[in-house]
């Protein structure tokens, strides 16, 4: 209960004044960050269970790092767009994130082709759910009546 008391004291003092817009921004930003982390985890899971020579594996760390770098690079646009609350930017970000959802959905059947690919399937399903939540939050949270 002490931690709640000092939080309320900070709020009364005016030091903790997070507006509705900041909370909305944090929701969008945090879900995009979680999507980024799920993307990195699915690359690592696929590398762990790689069946052949011409796939991502821990045996070739440079290629693995390049793959993770590409994933991070491709998720920078929705990460940057999560800072903006403009309706047009949110729609563009939502459409971009839909491609990420389709990528995670495409990894689910690929996980069945990998021997012992249960971890890849599990992470892909979790990534799909997080990405769908991110799209929903991006498009629905923070709507104003003047935006409609």
UniProtKB/Swiss-Prot annotation:
Protein name: Uncharacterized membrane protein YdeH
Cell compartment(s), UniProt: Cell membrane
Keywords, ordered alphabetically: Cell membrane, Membrane, Transmembrane, Transmembrane helix
Top-level taxon of origin: Bacteria
Membrane topology: Multi-pass membrane protein
Signal peptide: none
Transmembrane intervals: 29-49, 61-81, 99-119, 121-141
Gene Ontology terms: cellular component: plasma membrane
